[in-house]
Amino acid sequence: GKGNLVSERLKDFAMHEFSLLDGAVLECGCVYIVKLLENVSLTDNLSGIANPKSSTGRLDVFTRLIVDGAQEFEDVPAGYKGPLYAEISPRTFSILVRTGTRLNQLRIRRGFSITTDKEMEILQKHVGLVRTEDNDSLPDKIKNGVPLSVDLVGENGLIGYRARKHTRLIDVDKPGFYKRESFWEKITIEDLVYQNNNSKNGTSSSGLVLSPDAF
């Protein structure tokens, strides 16, 4: 919060400290605060916005940036000079990390701008931000961004993957090392739930049930 240092708040709330120098396990369901190796020194016209790396999200590792005096996560205010911290909470898999492991990223920006729906419509028309498998530009109405939809047909009946509940530890610094089948089970069209919507003509619709806390 405003006027507070993260290091001082950790003295009040942290249960214990440990080193990441030789590697450490971050357990599923626990919350960790880690001081990052990097500091920033921004001028008054520069600010930052952070977000997890895509690989971090694919492992369901909840990660967000914290700075001293911040009132919002993931935000580095203009002119900030000081340390950076990450809140890390593995949700599905326990992970092995070490000093130098990269879980999130920071974008430095000058000023503030946002792409309007009109600008997105122009890009969609001339570039095709979203396309079909046949490379046709989709004409969907753009509102607060480009809409995306779930594919419940899939390729060869495969529509997604569900994380296994009991798996081995994942070393996040070994990309491409593990077999997908060890951590994920396939979701196919056979897993769809069908509901009879029209008893007169026997038509039905299908959907996928998403269980709470499943990934």
Positions of PLM-derived features:
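DUTPase catalytic domain/fold
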Residues: 1-215
